[in-house]
């Protein structure tokens, strides 16, 4: 227990939490915090010793700097801590919590009074359970609470109160007879029980901008304390697209109508007035706004604040409507839409099956009501929402490491594309499987285990196509740490250390978003109006331009893709920062901007361009092509040629076997891939109707 001669008593304010003010942090002497820092750093070093891992000098310096920043943080501020994946980010959080948990055994402890409490946000349920146990075991009493709803992990541990569900899809939720007493379904009741609150990212999204509603807790005597420290493991989603279309507006009106019963006269009148004003000040202006939307420059267009106001979205009536909505019910869709309309400076339109407008913005994490917030992210320097955000302080990255053992292979070639849409086209998936097989054949002598990552939709089909290589490929590991018969997929690797034995990573596709998502992010980051001015100038020029292809938007795409690749490659043995094993990463048609971002991030890594695809990939693409549900002429021809036993045949024999007419046969012979096949694999003798084709045997090839 740390002694302190004089401690200023914490103010406790009862009543409405919105009226409470945070007490400034630095209320203990520097010597007390320095002692705490030494204990935390000792814990970090002990963790490395227990795991028999080496801690690089610059790595330990970076962790020490991060500890200092956390302990001396100020409420209302937000800091991003750039620690490379596998560099001790989770270890640092564990060391902090273990040391602070001991202090929270008694709120008379000066450190406990100083911090009041902590909120911790993690990605995986298993991590939350581990931290909860660590805190409570270290303190010898309950000082930490994990607040989470039912999920696969906790149900697999037998946390269902009546034992009927062992997986999330078996949980009855509101239909369960024990719903009202289930600690998982009623987890929000436990938000204010202990000084340390642990939650998952999904729940944190609900409180991100209203953190004051969960920043306090009460002890058994109903003494209230304020949690003044927030630790976030990995970058949360900070973007809000603010989408509005007729479907969303109708859904919001329906919610208002169904929220309260209409058989009470007063409620019915209140409801009718609300829906009338909703239609007048929101729905009708939206219909008018659609008339000024242009598609001259592609499916996306820019709308300025003047356009929105001219259509009828007036500040005064919207503010009046917001007050009435708040008086009617809190947290309605209608209230959120009105709030978005009041705070937007510019928006953009998207024309697809429906006409939508988007009012993007960055969520606000700073402010006097917010605790001192620290975002621990291994890709912070590749995240524009952190680096370009004036309200977030990015700590200096003092990490020094050579990445000379890392090599990126950029596969080029027009036959296969890296997008999910292309994967769905006939023959494309087979071509991808051929390409992966080709890469594995080249790499298997150098690498014992290979990690192939693709889109979730194709993870199982590709796994089945790659059956001959199952002994070298790593399967997908689910949330319960069990292997599944599919490839790992984008979005399914968060928080997993199950792929560390891989020394080669193959990215089967690039995890691109929709173009509107990158445009949304660019405008959300446009606090000073630079990007908006750039778009306006482009729209006023005589040269047509698509908004989603503007340089500023493409830059956001490049950084987003590069960030995903960095996180992915660190799932391999590159995560062992003290290691020397060569690491190879194969990328399929990456944009040059992505490669530049990777070069800046990894410094002295290596890049190799592969200019062309193997012949098997090109042929697989061609043989799988369909037109109106039927094989193309080239597909029919190539399929027959690949299955040909090589015996001498005449053109007439081929036409009869494939069902091609004489003109069709002549046409398909001019196809580049068919020509290439004949040049490489076929020997021609005779001429005219005496022409004979023979398949060249392997020796002759």
What residue ranges belong to the model's regions?
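ASCE RecA-like P-loop NTPase motor cores
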Residues: 2-701
């Amino acid at each position: 227990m740390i002694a302190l001669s004089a401690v200023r008593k914490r103010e406790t304010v009862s009543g409405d939490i919105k009226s409470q003010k945070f007490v400034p942090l630095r209320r203990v002497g520097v010597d007390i915090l320095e002692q705490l820092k030494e204990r935390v750093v000792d814990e970090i070093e002990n963790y490395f010793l227990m795991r028999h891992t080496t801690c690089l000098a610059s790595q330990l310096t970076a962790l020490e700097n991060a500890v200092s920043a956390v302990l001396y943080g100020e409420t209302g501020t937000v800091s991003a801590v750039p620690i490379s994946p596998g560099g001790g980010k989770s270890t640092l959080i564990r060391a902090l919590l273990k040391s602070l948990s001991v202090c929270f055994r008694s709120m008379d402890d000066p450190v406990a009074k100083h911090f009041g409490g902590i909120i911790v946000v993690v990605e995986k349920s298993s991590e939350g359970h581990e931290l909860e146990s660590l805190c409570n075991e270290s303190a010898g009493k309950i000082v930490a609470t994990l607040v989470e709803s039912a999920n696969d992990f906790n149900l697999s541990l037998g946390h269902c109160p009546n034992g009927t569900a062992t997986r999330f899809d078996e949980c009855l939720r509101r239909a369960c007879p024990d719903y009202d007493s289930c600690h998982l379904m009623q987890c929000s009741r436990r938000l204010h029980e202990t000084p340390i609150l642990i939650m998952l990212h999904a729940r944190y999204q609900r409180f991100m901008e209203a953190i004051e509603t969960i920043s306090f807790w009460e002890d058994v005597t109903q003494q209230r304390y304020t949690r003044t420290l927030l630790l976030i493991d990995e970058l949360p989603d900070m973007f809000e697209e603010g989408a509005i279309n007729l479907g969303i507006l109708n859904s919001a009106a329906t919610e208002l109508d169904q929220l309260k019963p209409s058989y009470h006269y007063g409620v019915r009148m209140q409801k009718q007035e609300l829906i009338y004003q909703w239609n007048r000040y929101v729905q009708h202006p939206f219909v008018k706004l659609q008339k000024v939307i242009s598609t001259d420059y592609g499916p996306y267009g820019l709308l300025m604040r003047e356009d929105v106001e001219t259509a009828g979205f007036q500040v005064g009536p919207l503010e009046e409507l917001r007050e009435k909505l708040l008086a009617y019910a809190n947290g309605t869709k209608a209230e959120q839409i009105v709030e978005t309309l009041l705070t937007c400076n510019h928006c953009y339109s998207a024309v697809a099956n429906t006409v939508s407008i988007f009012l993007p913005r960055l969520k606000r994490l700073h402010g006097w009501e917010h605790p001192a917030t620290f975002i621990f992210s291994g890709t912070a320097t590749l995240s524009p929402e952190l680096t370009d955000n004036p309200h977030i302080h990015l700590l200096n990255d003092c990490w020094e490491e050579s990445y000379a053992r890392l090599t990126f292979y950029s596969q080029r070639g027009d036959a296969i594309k890296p997008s999910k849409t292309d994967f769905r086209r006939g023959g494309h998936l087979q071509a991808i499987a051929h390409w992966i097989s080709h890469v594995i054949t080249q790499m298997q002598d150098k690498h014992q285990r290979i990690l192939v990552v693709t889109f979730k939709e194709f993870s199982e089909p590709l796994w089945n196509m790659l059956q001959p290589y199952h002994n070298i490929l790593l399967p997908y590991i689910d949330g319960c740490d069990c292997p599944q018969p599919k490839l790992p997929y984008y979005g399914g690797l968060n928080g997993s250390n199950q792929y560390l034995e891989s020394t080669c990573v193959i990215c089967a596709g690039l995890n691109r978003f929709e173009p509107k998502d990158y445009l949304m992010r660019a405008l959300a980051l446009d606090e000073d109006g630079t990007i908006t001015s750039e778009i306006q100038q482009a729209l006023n020029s005589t040269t047509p331009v698509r908004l989603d292809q503007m340089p500023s938007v493409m830059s956001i795409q490049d950084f987003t893709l590069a960030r995903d690749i960095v996180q992915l490659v660190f799932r391999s043995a590159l995560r062992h920062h003290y290691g020397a094993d060569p690491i190879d990463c194969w990328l399929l048609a990456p944009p040059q901007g992505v490669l530049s971002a990777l070069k800046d991030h990894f410094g002295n890594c290596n890049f190799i361009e592969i200019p062309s695809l193997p012949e098997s990939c090109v042929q697989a693409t061609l043989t799988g092509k369909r037109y109106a549900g039927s094989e193309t002429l080239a597909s029919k021809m190539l399929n027959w040629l690949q299955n040909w036993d090589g015996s001498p045949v005449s053109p007439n024999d081929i036409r009869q076997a494939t069902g091609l007419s004489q003109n069709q046969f002549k046409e398909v012979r001019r196809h580049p891939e068919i020509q290439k096949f004949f040049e490489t694999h076929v020997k021609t003798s005779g001429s005219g109707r005496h022409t004979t084709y023979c398949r060249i045997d392997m020796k002759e090839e």
